[in-house]
């Protein structure tokens, strides 16, 4: 996206303080940080919706956030962390998935506040059931696709030596 600051950082059309970069993601120090050492991680591709982010990039983003946090804790001696994932229409100026890691210090005067409300227990129960059932379906679909891939792998290697090795791995 032409007007997205995160895309401009990823494309190196504006300067930044890059902490980590690979083919998929980039991690930079926040130039307008809420606290010392705050940093941002985001995909290089313009992806707006977290639910469309592939698992590999998602895992990379959170893994890098952890390791950079470890390094920063050794340097800055912070007392805690807040990690904020922004996606889609969440009040941000640019609709580009970002993870913002904010080191926290005693008396840093940062306030994170949510307007909370008492949720209806029947809705919570309904939502819990829906989510757990969907997770079971996802898990079954994954296992079925994995079994299908194994069967295709067996068909490719008809030679008995390979077949024997395949059985040995699973015994």
Q: Which residues does each predicted region cover?
A:
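HIT superfamily nucleotide-processing domains
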Residues: 1-171
């Amino acid at each position: 996206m032409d007007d997205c600051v995160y895309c401009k950082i990823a494309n190196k059309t504006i300067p930044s303080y890059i902490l980590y970069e690979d083919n998929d993601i980039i991690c930079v120090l926040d130039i307008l940080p809420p606290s010392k050492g705050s940093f941002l991680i985001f995909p290089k591709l313009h992806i707006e919706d977290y639910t469309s982010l592939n698992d590999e990039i998602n895992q990379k983003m959170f893994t890098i956030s952890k390791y950079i946090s470890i390094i920063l804790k050794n340097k800055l001696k912070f007392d805690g962390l807040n990690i904020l994932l922004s996606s889609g229409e969440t009040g941000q100026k640019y609709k580009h998935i970002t993870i913002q890691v904010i080191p926290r210090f005693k008396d840093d005067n940062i306030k994170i506040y949510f307007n909370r409300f008492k949720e209806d227990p029947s809705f919570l129960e309904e939502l819990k059931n829906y989510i757990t059932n969907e997770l079971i379906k996802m898990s079954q679909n994954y296992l079925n696709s994995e079994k299908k891939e194994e069967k295709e792998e067996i068909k490719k290697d008809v030679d008995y030596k390979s077949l024997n090795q395949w059985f040995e791995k699973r015994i």
